[in-house]
């Protein structure tokens, strides 16, 4: 069980602290053989850069695309100007792509957990991990973004309450 949630997205469970990062997919299948080899080497380097004194979990979550979230966060709103025809076309392309994928989205996360004496030590540790992940996943043009508490709790909410994604509320 989670004992304490800190404002910077670090969670405490027993004597361990954890932090989660989201990373984006890379276009591996579309790359040349040489580029694929380079991507694989860089990905291995990113994983090998993770601390050996910590537990690391990679999570791949396939989830249904929520229509309301899709409209709110992905599609462009019309503004009543001369560019609305382009916005409609852009939205049509995105909507068609979403339909082709059976409305499934794949989210990828890395969660690192480590035993530390106190929060200050844990925070120092995670600052170093954050810098390493940002640098190494940046080489892949994938990026790694540390999740805040709202993002982490939303993952749990959406996973355990499919179809109720729009009911998520968080206030710390």
Description of each model-found segment:
Residues 1-172:
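Extended, folded cores of ATP/NTP-driven motor/assembly subunits in large transport
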């Amino acid at each position: 069980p989670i004992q304490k949630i800190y404002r910077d997205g670090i969670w405490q469970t027993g004597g361990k602290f954890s932090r989660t990062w989201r990373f984006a997919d890379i276009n591996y299948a579309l790359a040349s053989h040489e580029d694929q080899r380079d991507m694989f080497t860089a990905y291995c380097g990113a994983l090998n850069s993770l601390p050996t004194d910590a537990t690391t979990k990679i999570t791949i979550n396939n989830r249904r695309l929520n229509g309301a979230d899709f409209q709110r966060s992905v599609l462009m709103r019309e503004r009543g100007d001369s560019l609305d025809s382009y916005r409609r076309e852009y939205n049509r392309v995105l909507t068609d792509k979403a339909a082709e994928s059976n409305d499934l989205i794949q989210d990828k996360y890395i969660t690192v957990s480590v035993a530390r004496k106190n929060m200050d030590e844990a925070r120092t540790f995670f600052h170093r991990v954050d810098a390493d992940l940002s640098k190494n996943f940046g080489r892949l043009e994938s990026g790694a973004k540390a999740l805040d508490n709202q993002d982490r709790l939303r993952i749990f909410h959406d996973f355990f309450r499919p179809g109720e994604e729009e009911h998520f509320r968080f206030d710390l």
